[in-house]
Regions:
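Aromatic- and Gly/Pro-enriched helix-to-coil junctions and flexible linker segments
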Residues: 16-122
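Bacterial N-terminal signal peptides
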Residues: 2-17
């Protein structure tokens, strides 16, 4: 019985930790695959194809102001993050990914981005 009473708090802590990590959005697991498919073609490593001077594949660059002066990702502040504004806008001239890319994000993917930024974009 003593072993069970000692093991119970460890088991509960483990279950709570698992629930917390399932709700935590992770860049490499959740966001990078979406960005690789929809963002990095225009905002990745190749300076010849990079649009707007914005590089999203390097965190430090994504946190800086771009050519427009807007900051792509403001950790903890999705409403101030240009990426979030562009994902959710109804303006066809501003929406990202743009029409020419022939890429789209689902509502669930957009919300995942919002949660990731709100959680600190780590």
């Amino acid at each position: 019985m003593r072993v069970l009473s000692l093991a119970a708090p460890v088991l509960v802590a483990g279950l709570l930790g698992a629930a917390e990590s399932a709700d935590t959005v992770r860049f490499n697991r959740d966001i990078r695959p979406i960005m690789s498919d929809t963002c990095f073609h225009c905002h990745g490593f190749d300076p010849k194809s990079r649009k707007g001077g914005l590089r999203l594949d390097i965190r430090e660059d994504a946190l800086k102001a771009g050519k427009s002066g807007a900051i792509a990702i403001v950790p903890g502040k999705p409403d101030e993050s240009e990426v979030i504004k562009r994902l959710f806008t109804k303006d066809e001239d501003d929406v990202m990914p743009n029409k020419e890319s022939h890429k789209t994000l689902t509502a669930a993917q957009k919300e995942l981005f919002r949660r990731w930024v709100a959680q600190g974009a780590v």
